Structure formats: C-alpha cells, structure tokens
Amino acid sequence: IKYFIQKALGKKMFRKPRISVCVPSGVTEVEKKAVEDATYQAGAREVAIIEEPIAAAIGAGIDISRPCGNMIVDIGGGTADIAVISLGGSVVSTSIKIAGDDFDEAIVRYMRKKHNLLIGERTAEDIKIRIGSCFPQAQAETMDVRGRNLVTGLPKTVTVSSEETEEALREPTLQ
C-alpha cells in the first residue's frame, strides 16, 4: 500500500492522504480492520473501507442512495462479487472464488485442446475481453489469435469465434 501511495503522490506528499480501499463483499470485520490498519501504517490520514460491489455501482454511475434495488456483478481476477444495492448499502451480497483468472485459464485450456495452440494468459485475457461470451450472441464475433503450435513448435494463427469462447467458458460459469 505504501508503494502505491508514494507512486501516486511522488515527492509531493505534504499531508497524509485520504484513502478509500475496496474489499470483497462478505469479508469479516476482523479482515476489514486488518486492511484499515495496514492502510494507516502505510501513511494514510483517513481510511474508508468500501465493499467492491458498492464501488462498482458508483463507478457505473448508479445512484446508490435511491430506494430501488440494483443488482451488481463485479467480476475481478480472483473473486466475483454479486450484490443488490439500495439506499446506500448492500441489501444482500456474496463473494465467490470463480472469476476472471479462472476464465483466462479455461480459454488457455480450450485453445490447447481444440486448436493445439499454446497461448499465454495475456492472450487469453484479450480473447475474453474482445469476444468472450458466456451466452449465445445474436451475431458471432471472431478474432485472429497467435500462439505456438503444440505439434510443430512453430508460430500459428487461428481464427476464434465468440461461440468458441462460450464453449470454453461453460465449465467455470457452471461452477
């Protein structure tokens, strides 16, 4: 945390900063307190602990103070947080351990199995972001993907469709 404070403020740190830290929904009060203490020790003047779904709702431009429910699904790298937000807080929320990293790994496995193509996590993430889908799309999208042919060891390019990403992501989404 201290590294990021120094990185953001550089040498211009005249006053200790106010810092907001996001935590997954469902963390215990002890875990929140540990994050808060670590942030103070890193040099914060004030610390606000915000649950990730609430931060995601605010970031999406949702007025969280209104008396109507908004369902938020915040898929991070290691966890996915699902919450119903209303009147400035979470009505109900949960955090699951299936998230973006699992989707990337599923795409890597799919490319290896179906195309005999070795790709890295970065390429898998690019596929996920550009054409990834867990549901059938009205119009399929495609993209060219470069990797290493597992049979010849040479570079190889294949065209991958959103239907294939749907197939690749089926296993982690059903968990």
Locations of regions flagged by a protein language model:
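Conserved Rossmann-like nucleotide-cofactor binding loop
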Residues: 78
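Nucleotide/phosphate-binding catalytic cleft detector across ATP-hydrolyzing
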Residues: 1-75, 83-175
